[in-house]
């Protein structure tokens, strides 16, 4: 039988007690990996590995389509999306599908179409995955040399990297096209409480776009997560798409330099570790974006951010007490600081009380009430609009933390019954996934480096309990 692995490399792998167990023709003797090692059995079988990846893509797209239709079926137009536990429809709404002024859902048919298209796509991918896993050639090198590869072929690997970068760049341009030409996207900052609009004045200045990367991640700076302008977001995607496409072309046309050949480990497991590391970074950045940013993730769909809910409570009580005759400009709270308004460390007028820690919040319902030196007292007294009051009252009771509401410092009740903000779900899931992808990155990077150095030992199995158990057969 043709041995596809180095005996020296895999001498440590524990074998099954029943050596005859074979799954899809990939037994341990042939590959050096047991059945539960999954795709590791296919490291040197490019055709079968293609099948596994296409089938995996089919599963991902199937989930997207099925969950999309599930959310459409359960959607209640009279309630905000964030009160219904939705995580996919808010993304479609943010892209401008089916919504109008103030984030009101006008038509759910685009959401239905999206779900059906994903289901159809998943079927095509599923058939392709099954074909390549069961019927297609085991290796692509002989039949389709363009698609074939050897993990150690550095030039081929950077060509594949280039193709992936071009596809990512084209994905970024799809958002740009949607925003510029195909109906626009939802802008939470549009006058009067948000609306769908086409982006007409892209920000392409490298100083502005790359200035975000140079910002501090702390406080009012907020690194790239601080972006609060759709022109900057879409312009950033123009830059990102261009860099990815040009970088992809460059990687296809060039061979890796000598320093890159020396610096990197060139093996299947090493590439897996690099990919997991990149996905981990994506996960952590997405976590911060969905938790703090209310422009890319409008509060009309995802619910308020933590600081936004806190500031909304201060504004709601200021409006209420002002109508009852309180002088909100001079009233003192129990600490001697301003009860409703006070000054920040840098002199701006901000909301008083517990919410002062969130004084650098920017939100579309609040910014019209600011002047050159922070909150403007005369605007607070005269210019408040009903939509601002309604929105702040709604956000006050839908904090993403499900935090305790308080009146006069006494905790009274949780903000809403059975309410978990989509921001909480999305931020937590992306943080946890980002963390585990990082652990996977470290694990596979360590294994790849050890294998490259020639001293891979794996786990010492002499003391493993399973060795002394009765064989399964």
From Swiss-Prot:
One of its GO terms (biological process) is photosynthetic electron transport in photosystem II. This is Photosystem II CP43 reaction center protein. [CaMn4O5] cluster binds at residue 367. The chain crosses the membrane at residues 69-93, 134-155, 178-200, 255-275, 291-312, 447-471. The modification N-acetylthreonine is found at residue 15. It is a multi-pass membrane protein. Disulfide bonds: none annotated. Keywords: Acetylation, Chlorophyll, Chloroplast, Chromophore, Manganese, Membrane, Metal-binding, Phosphoprotein, Photosynthesis, Photosystem II, Plastid, Thylakoid, Transmembrane, Transmembrane helix. It comes from Zea mays (Maize). It is found in: Plastid, Chloroplast thylakoid membrane. Phosphorylated in both bundle sheath and mesophyll cells, phosphorylation increases when cells are grown under high rather than low light regimes (70 vs 900 umol photons/m-2/s). The lineage of its organism: Eukaryota, Viridiplantae, Streptophyta, Embryophyta, Tracheophyta. One of its GO terms (molecular function) is metal ion binding. Pfam families: PSII. Residues 1-14 form a propeptide. The modification Phosphothreonine is found at residue 15. Binds multiple chlorophylls and provides some of the ligands for the Ca-4Mn-5O cluster of the oxygen-evolving complex. It may also provide a ligand for a Cl- that is required for oxygen evolution. PSII binds additional chlorophylls, carotenoids and specific lipids. One of the components of the core complex of photosystem II (PSII). It binds chlorophyll and helps catalyze the primary light-induced photochemical processes of PSII. PSII is a light-driven water:plastoquinone oxidoreductase, using light energy to abstract electrons from H(2)O, generating O(2) and a proton gradient subsequently used for ATP formation.
